[in-house]
Swiss-Prot record:
It is a multi-pass membrane protein. GO terms for cellular component: plasma membrane. Belongs to the MsrQ family. InterPro entries: Fe3_Rdtase_TM_dom, MsrQ-like. This is Protein-methionine-sulfoxide reductase heme-binding subunit MsrQ.
Length: 206
């Protein structure tokens, strides 16, 4: 027997729980910092951890549409914006770690790094796209952009690909591809589902 559709009230109860869950990694950093648990290199730990949680939140965001269709719960789409904004939040912290700790707030050094290191180039491109989606995630932006809003926000899949490539190139230099392969496989499944759904709709329209 299919589950009853989630109501607006139920989604309203889920949102605070999702918000708290989204902040847990951030809170954990403070707890680790207060208890000398940020490893021997806290800067590297926080940079890597913020990047990992950016990718996790991004994949959760991409999973909302398949999940709502597979479960018959269209109201789940109301959680997608929060997941996407958490991806941008952790992505901003990851970007800030690079700007502040790695490049010392030096614009010239940042531009050189973007131009010389491919994994930085694709990571920077992913962040710029994420910033554009975060800035246009409001109801006002949806009304203002109209049909162009949906086209713009499909760039989330490009962001996913760029993020995986960024992670892959970074880990490839250390011959450690286990995590990039895991996250890349999840992204491939989500993209495959999306393509299959598009193909079915196209066939039904003929």
């Amino acid at each position: 027997m299919p589950a009853a559709p989630l109501t607006a009230r139920a989604i309203g109860r889920i949102k605070p729980l999702l918000f708290v869950a989204g902040l847990l990694p951030f809170a954990r950093w403070f707890w680790l910092g207060a208890n000398d648990g940020l490893s021997a290199n806290p800067v590297e730990f926080l940079t890597r951890s913020s990047g990992t949680w950016t990718l996790v939140c991004l994949l959760v965001t991409l999973a909302i549409t398949p999940l709502r269709r597979l479960t018959g719960q269209p109201a789940l789409v109301r959680l997608r914006r929060m997941c996407g904004l958490f991806a941008f939040f952790y992505g901003s912290l990851h970007f800030l770690a690079w700007v502040w700790w790695d490049r010392g707030l030096d614009p010239v050094s940042m531009l050189q790094d973007v131009g010389e290191r491919p994994f930085i180039t694709v990571g920077f491109a992913a962040f710029v796209l994420m910033a554009a989606l975060a800035a246009t995630s409001t109801q006002w932006a949806m009304r203002k952009l109209g049909k162009r809003w949906q086209v713009l926000h499909r760039a989330v899949y490009a962001i996913g690909l760029l993020a995986i490539l960024h992670f892959w190139w970074h880990k490839a230099g250390k011959n450690d591809l286990q995590q990039p392969l895991l996250y890349g496989s999840v992204l491939a499944l989500l993209l495959g589902w999306r393509v299959a759904a598009w193909w079915r709709r196209r066939g039904a329209a003929r």
